Amino acid sequence: MNTERDSETTFDEDSQPNDEVVPYSDDETEDELEDQGPAVEPEQNRVNREVEKKKETFRKDCTWQVKANDRKFHEQPHFMNTKFFCIKESKYASNAIKTYKYNALTFLPMNLFEQFKRAANFYFLILLILQAIPQISTLAWYTTLVPLLLVLGITAIKDLVDDVARHKMDKEINNRTCEVIKDGRFKIIKWKDIQVGDVIRLKKNDFIPADILLLSSSEPNSLCYVETAELDGETNLKFKMALEITDQYLQIEDNLATFDGFIECEEPNNRLDKFTGTLFWRNQSFPLDADKILLRGCVIRNTDVCHGLVIFAGADTKIMKNSGKTRFKRTKIDYLMNYMVYTIIIVLILVSAGLAIGHAYWEAQIGNYSWYLYDGENATPSYRGFLNFWGYIIVLNTMVPISLYVSVEVIRLGQSHFINWDLQMYYAEKDTPAKSRTTTLNEQLGQIHYIFSDKTGTLTQNIMTFKKCCINGTIYGDHRDASQHSHSKIELVDFSWNEFADGKLAFYDHYLIEQIQSGKEPEVRQFFFLLSICHTVMVDRIDGQINYQAASPDEGALVNAARNFGFAFLARTQNTITVSELGTERTYSVLAILDFNSDRKRMSIIVRTPEGSIRLYCKGADTVIYERLHRMNPMKQETQDALDIFASETLRTLCLCYKEIEEKEFAEWNKKFMAASVASSNRDEALDKVYEEIERDLILLGATAIEDKLQDGVPETISKLAKADIKIWVLTGDKKETAENIGFACELLTEDTTICYGEDINSLLHTRMENQRNRGGVSAKFAPPAYEPFFPPGENRALIITGSWLNEILLEKKTKRSKILKLKFPRTEEERRMRSQSRRRLEEKKEQRQKNFVDLACECSAVICCRVTPKQKAMVVDLVKRYKKAITLAIGDGANDVNMIKTAHIGVGISGQEGMQAVMSSDYSFAQFRYLQRLLLVHGRWSYIRMCKFLRYFFYKNFAFTLVHFWYSFFNGYSAQTAYEDWFITLYNVLYSSLPVLLMGLLDQDVSDKLSLRFPGLYVVGQRDLLFNYKKFFVSLLHGVLTSMVLFFIPFGAYLQTVGQDGEAPSDYQSFAVTMASALVITVNFQIGLDTSYWTFVNAFSIFGSIALYFGIMFDFHSAGIHVLFPSAFQFTGTASNALRQPYIWLTIILTVAVCLLPVVAIRFLSMTIWPSESDKIQKHRKRLKAEEQWKRRQSVFRRGASSRRSAYAFSHQRGYADLISSGRSIRKKRSPLDAIIADGTAEYRRTVES
């Protein structure tokens, strides 16, 4: 017990997590963690590790081998794989692609097989087989076959149309042509004939036919421009660069034909931005990475000619590897609907069994003694009851609706199109409409509890502007600082003295320009020189003007800033970079580029100056830079203070530093660097370790501050969503101060919000864990008997936590002991048992702590997680899904949000400045965060209401229809006879009752879109599952049961002793069936009229049209002419005309319909009068609200200002944002009752009208 207590997460001063440290990377290995500090290692573990290392030397990650211009090499036996028995195929795929599923021979069997894998279709297939057995079925075979064929046919036609389109596309692509070296010369061949190892030639605007290694280009410096829109949706051009040696020697046809390079690289995979390989040629090895690979699907742009070597073809290409099936998401209603169908099946079996027992008893007591019922078979009552069980399964099968799933898909498809067509979610500035990328999740948009949002590019614009900087401890950039430098100018700086200035940078500090031009402080010039040289930006000249292509908006903003301040990046080759320094062009030799990635959080470049000295320039996050600074950096504290100021103003920061490198030191390091660059295994890890050796003892120059403005409408959107009881969590990689101020800017945080940080959270969780342990909560894996809140009720709390604290609190932090204690050799049984118990206790404690954290966080009105990795973003989403069982939505715009978007129930992508990775992984996409309120509060709520109404009505109408057979069975000896005509049973769900409910599921709306946005509190019905749950389900079933009783017993009583006008009794079975069927069709169609809130001509036409269609078909099917053609199928000859000419029959139908519907009308009236819902109240005052809205639009609205919480807040220089930032309004204030809101608005409107 003591050991367990000690293992609880507590911290002393030295071990406390650092809020500024980005937690371990997703790819961090155990070996890297072990290097973080010394530890006592057991001898056996050391031996085991050495053995593993020896084995590791024989392992290679690069097992894919390619030989240029040698097709026979790839046909060797050891490259052949066994596919089926003795049939073998090459390891290397052909370049022909096949995306279609069927051909002329396989379509019918394969499509039917796929459709019958669905449980509902298979169920009805079994019913159809049972109906073919005469001893069982009392129903004609076509009653099941026609609806089943209709469902199968609709799906098959859709699949066929899709597959024919795929056939055409495959044929078009495979028959494209390309120039390939064959027999020493370039020849034109089709794409499908290209093979791995071929050397190909591509020209401007050509599509790239396979994944190829760029060998040479007609552009200077071996550059090749490609457009990657088909891969990632991005339309801006990318730059690829060939190896210098191949570009130099492989320009002409003869040299390309004799090229015999050999490549070892990674196996085919779906990582678009990763490639590891080595080219062996001329007794040398050259490292290959993704920058030298042209991917299939891209287009050559602005490059006349380029040559490449095919590495991956056809199905092995990265674009094809990414075309696999995505994880299928299902809605909460899907699961509930399936459970309800299972419930109906159980009810069906129980009812059929009960009626079968009744038939066996009836046979024993009555049937066996009734000579006129003898059928020639001497079966026992038990056997007849057994056969009757299956007969009732067939008769009552319509309790399980065959068309339910098809109807649901049609409704969802229509709702998705409504989202796509919504012009109010169209962003005209970028011509970007909203896009529903899935058709299966629409109603779940109306049930969201938690939104997890990225910050940069989602809440903000991700348009970076250089605003401030700190150089050598001095802050530049704010016009208010001018007085400190004896200047009073506040106008914009004039950059006309600089020929390379782009004229777009708005900067106010004239003193910085004086410092640059005078050269009094060399660090200032060095600062901007670093920005101009330390990057991976590519330059292009359009109409004589410099145009930069940057990997990220931040990098582009910094290089453009350097350009405006006189240090313009002009050109680069593989080995040089040219910069204009205050008008003087200088070229530097590039010795190495230590590239940026999300784990390193920095990039460096090593250059040789024209004078011959070697320097390393580095820029990166302050957390990683400060760890690598030389101890003698006098301006560390001043720069840190500046970083804090920048963060308080929500500016994004980077630190800049450099170091001088001795020639000998660089030579030794370069050997390691070159070795790591061509490593066959773990190349990235090897390079990172080499980078670490040189990136140390750095000299700090200063820091940059970039502004990223808030998007339009973000505060209003967050406020609306909060009023809808949706909690918003912001997950970002930014600094804590920046994230906190963004929280205030978008009104997630307000002046009356009490903020809890990592230390507070850890203390609260520690106390809760202790209390639970004392009650036996952890070991028993049970929560306390009653939930105990962490905070007093009524307090407005927010939680801000960093990634480091998140790992500590959730016990997710990896430790170096994890591998040391992992013994390779067998342990004793006692050791295994103790290890197992210890591991189980740790897992239990971890699970309990995570649950407590989620409970604590969910009590807060806002949660902001900063300095978090993509993996942590997904982990936080998963925790809320797991422990709160709540519906989650994740929204982001970048590749680092993809994991989070895929983890959430619904993923939304913002098509912004960071490419299209998030959009391509999302379920819905649009251009601005503010459209989220319309997606949820309008489309989501409508879709949820429509789907709930549809399902409730669907179950009701099927039970009302089917259970008439149940009541009829009490009067026919439980003999599984049907109460209706066979053709009516066949067409009821297909024609007579299908269209109105489909239109209700597509078009119905309780209130307008404007009122939905004005009263976000209406949204809670979906969150609380108020419109579709087991209670509503059973109410619908009960309604159907009662309706079926009325439909049967009123006509039954009316027919019992009746004589018509002609003196004949109309109480025959066929007239009785017509009367019940007519009453049923009128009842269910009028019932949907009562359920409809939004009437259109289409709704009315569908209801009355369905009734008219029923009577038209009935009179046709009961005519003598069709009976003559098909006497066995149409046996109700003349029934409709004979029965419906009797006024008594019409009186019976009207009475039946009235008794079915009038109680519903009465109950609805009482409910809306005595217990009105929020929606009912708004509908009641709809005209007043509309008038009030029109009046408000005519009035000028004035707001009183308020003092700003941050006096140095620099989020925007435009008028109007200060009110949003500093209004002090709480987004969690208690809402007024809806009646009071309406009453106040009405009173105000009346007073204005009267005045």
Curated annotation (Swiss-Prot):
<keyword id="KW-0547">Nucleotide-binding</keyword>
<feature type="transmembrane region" description="Helical">
    <location>
        <begin position="1095"/>
        <end position="1115"/>
    </location>
</feature>
<feature type="topological domain" description="Cytoplasmic">
    <location>
        <begin position="166"/>
        <end position="339"/>
    </location>
</feature>
<protein>
    <recommendedName>
        <fullName>Phospholipid-transporting ATPase IC</fullName>
        <ecNumber>7.6.2.1</ecNumber>
    </recommendedName>
</protein>
<feature type="compositionally biased region" description="Basic and acidic residues">
    <location>
        <begin position="43"/>
        <end position="52"/>
    </location>
</feature>
<dbReference type="GO" id="GO:0045176">
    <property type="term" value="P:apical protein localization"/>
</dbReference>
<feature type="transmembrane region" description="Helical">
    <location>
        <begin position="983"/>
        <end position="1003"/>
    </location>
</feature>
<dbReference type="GO" id="GO:0032534">
    <property type="term" value="P:regulation of microvillus assembly"/>
</dbReference>
<feature type="binding site">
    <location>
        <position position="873"/>
    </location>
    <ligand>
        <name>ATP</name>
    </ligand>
</feature>
<dbReference type="GO" id="GO:0007030">
    <property type="term" value="P:Golgi organization"/>
</dbReference>
<feature type="topological domain" description="Extracellular">
    <location>
        <begin position="1054"/>
        <end position="1071"/>
    </location>
</feature>
<feature type="binding site">
    <location>
        <position position="596"/>
    </location>
    <ligand>
        <name>ATP</name>
    </ligand>
</feature>
<feature type="active site" description="4-aspartylphosphate intermediate">
    <location>
        <position position="454"/>
    </location>
</feature>
<dbReference type="GO" id="GO:0016887">
    <property type="term" value="F:ATP hydrolysis activity"/>
</dbReference>
<feature type="topological domain" description="Cytoplasmic">
    <location>
        <begin position="407"/>
        <end position="952"/>
    </location>
</feature>
<feature type="binding site">
    <location>
        <position position="733"/>
    </location>
    <ligand>
        <name>ATP</name>
    </ligand>
</feature>
<feature type="binding site">
    <location>
        <position position="454"/>
    </location>
    <ligand>
        <name>Mg(2+)</name>
    </ligand>
</feature>
<feature type="topological domain" description="Extracellular">
    <location>
        <begin position="143"/>
        <end position="144"/>
    </location>
</feature>
<feature type="binding site">
    <location>
        <position position="456"/>
    </location>
    <ligand>
        <name>Mg(2+)</name>
    </ligand>
</feature>
<dbReference type="GO" id="GO:0032420">
    <property type="term" value="C:stereocilium"/>
</dbReference>
<dbReference type="GO" id="GO:2001225">
    <property type="term" value="P:regulation of chloride transport"/>
</dbReference>
<feature type="transmembrane region" description="Helical">
    <location>
        <begin position="340"/>
        <end position="360"/>
    </location>
</feature>
<dbReference type="GO" id="GO:0000287">
    <property type="term" value="F:magnesium ion binding"/>
</dbReference>
<dbReference type="InterPro" id="IPR023298">
    <property type="entry name" value="ATPase_P-typ_TM_dom_sf"/>
</dbReference>
<dbReference type="GO" id="GO:0140345">
    <property type="term" value="F:phosphatidylcholine flippase activity"/>
</dbReference>
<feature type="transmembrane region" description="Helical">
    <location>
        <begin position="386"/>
        <end position="406"/>
    </location>
</feature>
<dbReference type="InterPro" id="IPR044492">
    <property type="entry name" value="P_typ_ATPase_HD_dom"/>
</dbReference>
<dbReference type="GO" id="GO:0005524">
    <property type="term" value="F:ATP binding"/>
</dbReference>
<dbReference type="InterPro" id="IPR001757">
    <property type="entry name" value="P_typ_ATPase"/>
</dbReference>
<dbReference type="InterPro" id="IPR032631">
    <property type="entry name" value="P-type_ATPase_N"/>
</dbReference>
<feature type="compositionally biased region" description="Acidic residues">
    <location>
        <begin position="25"/>
        <end position="35"/>
    </location>
</feature>
<dbReference type="GO" id="GO:0045892">
    <property type="term" value="P:negative regulation of DNA-templated transcription"/>
</dbReference>
<keyword id="KW-0479">Metal-binding</keyword>
<dbReference type="GO" id="GO:0005886">
    <property type="term" value="C:plasma membrane"/>
</dbReference>
<dbReference type="Pfam" id="PF00122">
    <property type="entry name" value="E1-E2_ATPase"/>
</dbReference>
<dbReference type="Pfam" id="PF16209">
    <property type="entry name" value="PhoLip_ATPase_N"/>
</dbReference>
<feature type="transmembrane region" description="Helical">
    <location>
        <begin position="1033"/>
        <end position="1053"/>
    </location>
</feature>
<feature type="topological domain" description="Cytoplasmic">
    <location>
        <begin position="1093"/>
        <end position="1094"/>
    </location>
</feature>
<dbReference type="GO" id="GO:0005783">
    <property type="term" value="C:endoplasmic reticulum"/>
</dbReference>
<feature type="glycosylation site" description="N-linked (GlcNAc...) asparagine">
    <location>
        <position position="368"/>
    </location>
</feature>
<feature type="binding site">
    <location>
        <position position="897"/>
    </location>
    <ligand>
        <name>Mg(2+)</name>
    </ligand>
</feature>
<dbReference type="InterPro" id="IPR032630">
    <property type="entry name" value="P_typ_ATPase_c"/>
</dbReference>
